[in-house]
Each structure stands twice: as structure tokens, then as C-alpha cells.
């Protein structure tokens, strides 16, 4: 985890800022320009990981079984995944890497299939609410914990951040936070860092 955090920081910035990872799991750290300072200790996928793939996968499953998902979306979700309760419980409680299994459902948010346009408003509203709740939760727990949060840019790493950029902007405004860079793949930023700071 420490190596991932350091890589994320150097992929995003060389200046002071807060760097957030939204991947299978989630994390954040404050970089003062020299040293990386982690946020709260992570207690893992079952207790934390706000706005991660694991978090959104769990939310989708809960909404499906609690009938909180729009009907047309629920039908497509059931078509795409094996939602047999015993299969889900086996993968979550008996198999290795349950966090990755849960995160695999999150791709549905950004690729819900060929759904009819007449359902677009309901579907987009559902996904907007789902994502914004996760992002707000992350901001409150993993960004505002740093006293520097309103003084430095907030950078994001990961596919979830990449596909949710507009929602992240909306969520940051009430907290008077400044959005920095959003990088889908950390390796892209690391290559740029290497070119600009190592090769020169």
C-alpha cells in the first residue's frame, strides 16, 4: 500500500497537494512537496474503502437485492452478472480477494449496456446519486481530515475518478476544494515524471 501511495503521488504532482486513489480500494495522502503523509489508517475493504470499486460494487448488490435499483437497470444487472445469493456469499466469504470480486460489479456503473433512451433520466439520476454519495463520503473521511485540504489542489488517480470527473467537481464545490489532476492510470503520470525530472 505504501508503494502504491508513493507512486500515486509522483504520478500526480511534484508540488504540495492531496493525492487520492480510487481503485479497487481507496486511500489518500498529503504531499508537502517533500514527504508523503498518509490519512487515517485503513481498516480494509469491509470497513472503509469509500468511493472505491469495492464500495460501489457492494452498493450495487445491496440496491439490487433491496429493490432500490430502477427496474430496467435491475434487469440488465441480472443479465450481466451471476446474482445467485449462494454464489455471491461463496465469493465474498470463502474465496480469496473478495474485495476484487466486489469491485468487479462496479464496472456496471460506467458501462450499463444498451438501455433505452426513455429510461436515461431515471438511470442517470440513480447513478449520479450513487456516485455522489460515495464521493462525498470519501471527501469527508479522506480529504477533509487534512488541515491543508482547502489550501492545496486535490488530485485523483484511478478509473473511477476518470469516469466520474464531473461528479467529483460537483461534490468538491460545497467544501471549497480545488480539483487538481485526474489520472486514469498512474503509469502515465510516472512516465511523465521520469521524462521531466529524471532524464533531464
Describe each region flagged by the PLM.
Residues 1-75:
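Phosphate-binding/catalytic loop of phosphoryl-transfer enzymes
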Residues 11-18, 61-200:
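ATP-binding/phosphotransfer module of carbohydrate and carboxylate kinases, centering on a glycine-rich
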Amino acid at each position: 500500500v505504501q508503494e502504491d501511495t508513493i507512486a500515486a503521488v509522483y504520478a500526480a504532482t511534484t508540488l504540495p497537494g492531496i493525492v487520492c486513489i480510487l481503485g479497487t480500494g481507496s486511500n489518500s495522502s498529503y504531499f508537502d512537496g517533500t514527504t508523503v503523509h498518509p490519512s487515517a489508517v485503513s481498516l480494509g475493504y469491509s470497513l472503509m474503502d469509500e468511493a472505491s470499486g469495492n464500495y460501489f460494487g457492494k452498493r450495487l448488490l445491496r440496491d439490487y437485492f433491496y429493490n432500490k435499483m430502477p427496474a430496467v437497470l435491475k434487469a440488465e444487472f441480472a443479465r450481466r452478472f451471476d446474482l445467485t445469493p449462494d454464489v455471491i456469499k461463496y465469493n465474498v466469504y470463502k474465496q480469496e480477494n473478495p474485495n476484487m470480486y466486489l469491485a468487479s460489479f462496479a464496472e456496471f456503473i460506467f458501462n450499463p449496456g444498451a438501455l433505452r433512451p426513455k429510461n436515461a433520466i431515471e438511470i442517470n439520476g440513480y447513478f449520479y446519486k450513487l456516485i455522489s454519495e460515495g464521493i462525498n463520503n470519501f471527501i469527508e473521511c479522506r480529504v477533509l481530515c487534512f488541515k491543508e485540504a482547502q489550501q492545496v489542489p486535490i488530485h485523483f488517480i484511478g478509473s473511477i475518478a476518470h469516469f466520474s470527473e464531473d461528479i467529483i467537481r460537483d461534490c468538491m464545490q460545497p467544501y471549497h476544494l480545488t480539483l487538481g489532476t485526474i489520472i486514469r492510470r498512474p503509469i502515465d503520470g510516472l512516465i511523465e515524471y521520469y521524462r521531466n525530472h529524471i532524464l533531464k
